[in-house]
């Protein structure tokens, strides 16, 4: 039976207090905080983080597909899934696809992955949902939105979560949308949108699921329920007859915010972190219709506890000191023109060195075992020529050997910290440090690698691996 074999999650390091948002606009923005992607993060980089977490300790050769779900892919015309697959070091002989333009894209991708495995077209399929939505300043969405990602490995062996039943329907109802070329979201009057849209649609889907399988709220250990906001979440929980104190998964509104297509998947990851064998979960996602699933947790859940998931990332955070820092990260203002030549890129170089850039492959000398980056023809230790094998470095941790700080660099967050990292197992890597406190950078600091968007030279996103302090 096809089901969830593994899971992973990601929440950016930075948080923005809703109190700061309210002070910026002299209004009330609610309680709690929302997650904020760093200036070099987007839905693709966060998706890779979730995939890395999901695949922790697993072989990748059996994966036959990757489906990427998002309403904010970095390219309007260019597949994101193929880049995520390369950065995640998946085999080239896989099927990739993007699912987009709907908040329900995450469960849509999951359903197709389940069908793919059931049909025998792939042994395993990796599904990742990630969103990095930007709300209009001083809008109702600005304090509500958050950034994050979740990933699930779908397979038919060592299944940790069985798909015991499902119900879905499509709807053309308009609630939140963006037109072609628009950055910010539109919506209609709240009572109409919620009463005729979310509330009515979810109630219809869950009632149909209960009737189809002969179940009631008492048959479930946990309800994982998508909602547009906390108020409507509480309303529908009551309407469906679930106990809000004992049966309902916390919806992350006060700690992360609404993460778009990744919102329901991230809540499911949080639920699975606490799930025990024998638990039964009702998983409901909404957006242009409804997907509802009955999930059964097996004993295999105990074998995938070593994930950072949601709990670890919730505890690992850094508060933005000002609202203006968020404005800078999101590029919400027109800035003074830079007095320097523009960033440039070379597609031939990016293609020729793709294994070193996206997959972060170094080479290991077959004669002496020395690991080296970037790949070169001659071993720097024993001088053996053209006798090496490529090795993956992206999942290695390391220590800072030396570093420098540039206070005049043209980056959104000064200083620009450059370092040389000694990787565990061998290899030395020259890169930038992100998600950092400059005052805490020191020689010997433990770091890990993360893929980020270095710049947008020549009209394309230039992704590369950076160092960051290990999130603990």
Positions of predicted regions on the chain:
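Condensing-enzyme catalytic core mediating Claisen C-C bond formation in acyl metabolism
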Residues: 1-43, 139-196, 200, 276, ...
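Conserved catalytic cysteine-centered active-site region
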Residues: 24-28, 32-45, 72-125, 235-267
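Phosphate/pyrophosphate-binding loops at sites that engage ATP/ADP/AMP, CoA/4′-phosphopantetheine
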Residues: 50-64, 203-221, 240
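Cys/His-rich short segments
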Residues: 339-397
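Conserved hydrophobic positions within beta-strands
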Residues: 398-400, 433
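Short aromatic-glycine-enriched beta-strand elements
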Residues: 408-420, 461-465
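Short nucleic-acid-contacting surface segments enriched for D/E, G, S/T with interspersed K/R
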Residues: 435-449
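OB-fold/S1-family single-stranded nucleic acid-binding modules
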Residues: 450-472
């Amino acid at each position: 039976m096809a089901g969830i074999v593994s899971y992973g999650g990601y929440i950016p390091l930075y948080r923005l207090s809703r109190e700061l948002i309210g002070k910026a606009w002299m209004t009330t923005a609610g309680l709690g905080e929302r997650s904020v992607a760093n200036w070099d993060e987007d839905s693709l980089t966060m998706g890779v983080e979730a995939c890395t977490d999901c695949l922790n300790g697993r072989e990748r050769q059996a994966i036959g597909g990757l489906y990427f779900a998002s309403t904010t892919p970095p390219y309007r015309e260019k597949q994101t899934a193929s880049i995520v697959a390369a950065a995640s070091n998946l085999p080239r002989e896989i099927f990739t696809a993007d699912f987009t333009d709907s908040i329900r894209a995450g469960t849509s991708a999951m359903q197709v992955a389940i069908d793919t495995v059931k049909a025998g077209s792939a042994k395993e399929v990796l599904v990742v949902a990630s969103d990095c939505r930007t709300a209009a300043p001083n809008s109702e969405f600005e304090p509500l939105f958050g950034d994050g990602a979740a990933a699930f490995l779908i397979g038919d062996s060592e299944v940790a979560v069985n798909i015991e039943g499902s119900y879905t329907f499509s709807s053309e109802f308009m609630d939140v949308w963006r037109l072609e070329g628009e950055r910010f979201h539109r919506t209609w009057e709240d009572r109409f949108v919620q009463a005729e849209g979310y509330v009515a649609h979810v109630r219809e889907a869950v009632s149909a699921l209960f009737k189809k399988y002969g179940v009631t709220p008492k048959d479930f250990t946990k309800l994982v329920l998508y909602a547009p906001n906390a108020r409507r979440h509480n309303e529908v929980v009551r309407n469906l007859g679930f106990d809000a104190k004992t049966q309902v998964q916390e919806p992350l509104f006060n700690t992360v915010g609404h993460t778009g297509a990744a919102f329901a998947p991230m809540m499911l990851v949080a639920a699975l972190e606490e799930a025990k064998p024998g638990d039964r979960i009702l998983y409901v996602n909404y957006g242009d219709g409804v997907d509802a699933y009955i999930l059964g947790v097996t004993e295999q859940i105990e074998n995938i506890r070593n994930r950072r998931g949601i709990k670890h990332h919730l505890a690992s955070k850094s508060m933005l000191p000002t609202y203006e820092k968020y404005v800078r990260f999101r590029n919400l203002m027109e800035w003074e023109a830079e007095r320097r030549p523009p960033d440039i890129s070379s597609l031939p170089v990016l293609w020729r060195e793709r294994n070193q850039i996206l997959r972060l492959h170094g080479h290991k000398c077959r004669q002496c075992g020395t690991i080296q980056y970037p790949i070169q023809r001659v071993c720097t230790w024993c001088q053996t020529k053209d006798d090496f094998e490529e090795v993956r470095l992206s999942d290695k941790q390391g220590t800072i050997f030396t570093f420098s700080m540039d206070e005049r660099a043209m980056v959104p967050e000064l200083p620009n910290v450059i370092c040389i990292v000694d990787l565990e197992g061998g290899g030395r890597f020259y890169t930038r440090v992100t998600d950092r406190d400059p005052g805490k950078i020191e020689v010997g600091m433990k770091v890990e690698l993360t893929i980020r968007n270095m710049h947008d030279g020549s009209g394309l996103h230039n992704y590369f691996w950076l160092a960051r302090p290990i999130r603990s």
